[in-house]
Amino acid sequence: MKGLSGSRSHHHVVTCDPSFESMGHHLDHKPYLISQIDNPHPVDHSYYSQRSPYQPDCVVPYGTFPRRHYSSQHELKDEMAVVPYSGGGVPASKGQQRLPVALLDQFDRQLPVPRDGYHTLQYKRAAAALEQRSDSPGRIRHLVHSVQKLFTKSHSLEGPHHGHGHGKGSINGGKASPDGEPPAIRHRKRSKSRERCKSAEPKNRTPPSGYWSSDELEREACLFHHGPPGVMTMGRHPDKSQSQYFLEAYNTINDQALKNSRSNNDLGKCSTCTSIPLSVDASQLVKKSSWSSSLTVSRARQVYQKASVNVDKALVKAEACQQERSCQFLQLWKCVFVELSVCLDADMHVWAKVCDVASLLNRQVPQDEWGGFPLGKDEDIPCRRMRSGSYVKAMAEDDSGDSDGSPKPSPKMQARRASYLKATQPSLTEMTTLKISQEHSPKLQIRSHSYLRAVSEVSINRSLDTLDPKALLASPQYRSRNESYMRAMSTISQIEAMCESVFNEMESHAVDALDLPMPGCFRMRSHSYVRAIDQGCSQDDDSPLLPASPPRTTTTVRTIQSSTVSSCITTYKKTPPPVPPRTSTKPFISITAQSSTESAQDAYMDGPGTRGEPVLHSGLSNSTESIDSMKALTAAIEAANAQIHGPASQHVSNSTMTISTAPPSPLPLPVPVPVPIPIPALEDVRRDVLRKSRCLSIGIQSKFQSVGVQVEEEHGVTTAVQADLDTPDYTPADSPVTDFPAAGCLSRQYSRDAATSTVSIQGSGNHYHACTSDDYEDVGFDPSILPPPDPWIDSVIEDSLEVVGRSVCQRDGRWFLKLLQAETERMEGWCRQMEHDEKENKMPDEVLGKIRGAVGSAQLLMSQKFQQFRELCEENLNPNAHPRPVAQDLAGFWDMLQLSIENISLKFDELHQLKANNWRPLDPPERKERRLPPPVPKKPPKAHPPLARDRSLESTEKQRQEARKRLMAAKRAASVRQNSATESADSIEIYIPEAQTRL
């Protein structure tokens, strides 16, 4: 690849060398470039521009290196190209005739020999530079002449003498012959070089003639790479490193030199060519660059057309076809590859190289076949089809709005792209800017950006192991691209092979990126998504998740499955999770999701749980505030974490069915290591805050994995994936089981989740639950609690919610057992408190009777109804139970118990009031007070006493009714909260899955 780009950069090299920099300023050089750029026809090419008069004004506009580069590129390419634009026998004089006298002189010196399809613009420039450097024209002319002869020989070996039209027979002949039509045709062909991509040339460039002639490549490259030569070299100045390297390798372009260059030592030297003195003749540099270009390009086409995975085999075949030329080419290729490998110091460099090669291939490949990397219309692209290929479409989608026709992406798109690139791979962005910023046209920049972005995304979203270049090339989608594209990609893959592993993965990524079967996946996300990615990137960085997560099962997120964590980053939107109830489409999913989330969370907790999650968990009760505030935070963070790592955990849970009773704890183990690292800190902090914030109420629940909603949401996030599994049945039992098996880790997770999840899912349930549970647990039996039975009900409900959440918000036996246990403890506390008060205080018999009645009722309820309900719950948990009650049965029985519990709570409420009144009956005072007024009216007194009694009775009844109403209201509120919490949990879980799916 670098060889190709290097050929372009060779002129660059020449110009870059201090000795050659002046060349760029020469009118000769500039005119060459100008004519190339300005003239659409071959005459316009630097090759033809040489023939055309070079005007100083042209030179001025193209005095930049790229222009010189263009001219040198064109010349190199033309020279390299077998295409006989100037005609094998067409002397440079033709072009010179059009040129000014000074230019003609330079040409005479530089182009004493007919171009024979070889353009010597570089040589001319080099010669000019050399002349300026006081190099003798004779020496330059001699060098140029010898180089041209050598090229002629090598090209004749190629069979590309395009001018001769015998190229078809040669490896590059298919194209060479078209290009290599008689010199007279040369101009026509030259002009056709552009049209070639459009129509005739595509045939030549078809896979049969898949070898792009160096001439074609050069011409196209020139056309397409006016200023990009530097880009092709990835910001590296190929002029020095490459040119020097080539100079050393090609000082003498002969078999011996080639052999030397082939040797590893020479290759190393080539890579270190930068040390080569600049004193080397520009012509030598030119020879090196042009010769390497011709050999490299044509030969590369040969070798890579072979489509042989083994470059050596391809090279051997090439040698069999043409021993001498193949040998030279191999040597050149090896040097180029060595150079490339040396240059590929980092992935960025590799990517840049890949991009450069891809762009080069795009321009070199028959552009009619090429659908990708279309250049801006402002740039004359021989092949307009490039703008309408499937690849272009893919790239356009990848650009997310960057239409091929648009010279630049919209500012919004640019901003999004920049943010995305920054979030994903700032280095790539930098490289892209480096590479594309100055030398490419805006459209080229867009393409390059899109390409880099695609590549980076591919690297991000696809595991390297999945990017087998061979598989990619063999894939129908890849083939669906164009043959030419395949050739380009095959070339890339071959180069990759030459570059060894350094280039392998990157190239495969490049191939995949170019192929981009899922362009939509790479569309730029919103800034919020990018921010979420930024937050999750560090976590996603935990590649262990990929291995840790089992094979993506049927997770809704295809991208995640394909790319797991990295993909997750891209696919998962961290921001959405905070918006819990997106759509509660599948309660089952939510349940399952919870399990999966649970597994993911468990994994987190297992790793982080050891951090002290268990302690915090037990201590952690989601206070209303903590739940609310943490709700968004936890939901977002856990959602992001679960999603980031969730994919792994999800996948793990999916494959392992984390929901499974036993598996959940194991799953956490696999996932936890990777997951905990990223999530733990935030979650730990949050959990710590929540725990510190208070609420033992959830303490019990946390023990139970706290509010089911909490757990649910936590699990909901990861569960999202598991939701896909839809294993609600497993989830309820499993999650509880998981809690117990992984009690420490899971409990921590759940507590954390409860705090986190409950916030978003249980929301209201947790709010009152936190307070209520805390109150009751703290109070035990505080008479004050009795007056507001709502709290205990709420807390109970919340507990149940916790249990439910823990069991994916599913009301299973475990969940109800937790509720029952909490209720039993509460009632026992009341009974103990009343008994203690009875012993400590002297009370009227009436009060004692009430106390005993309330305590007896509570004990009876606990001994009978509660025991019966406990048995039902156990049966529900027992899969072997034949008449196994379902969750609905348990819920119905629990509702019945609520009535009895309310009655008992009313009794204790009354006792609480009596206690507040120092155990004195409440009615007598009222009666007395009311009796006093009646005596005032003498007549009404008779009726008044009954009235007073009625009033006292009414007041008592009112109080009872009010208490009952409060209890009923509390019950209804608790039921509503419980239901809403469950629903919200389900919806949230579903939402999370959807978010993941929407990824």
Curated annotation (Swiss-Prot):
UniProt protein name: Disks large-associated protein 1
Region Disordered: start-end pairs: 155-213, 395-418, 918-989
Family designation: Belongs to the SAPAP family.
Subcellular location: Cell membrane; Postsynaptic density; Synapse
Function: Part of the postsynaptic scaffold in neuronal cells.
Extent of motif PDZ-binding: 997-999
Biased composition (Polar residues): 976-985
Membrane topology value: Peripheral membrane protein
Organism annotation: Danio rerio (Zebrafish)
UniProt feature coiled coil, ranges: none
GO biological process, one term: signaling
Superkingdom in the source lineage: Eukaryota
Biased composition (Basic and acidic residues): 194-204, 923-932, 947-965
Keywords per UniProt: Cell membrane, Membrane, Synapse
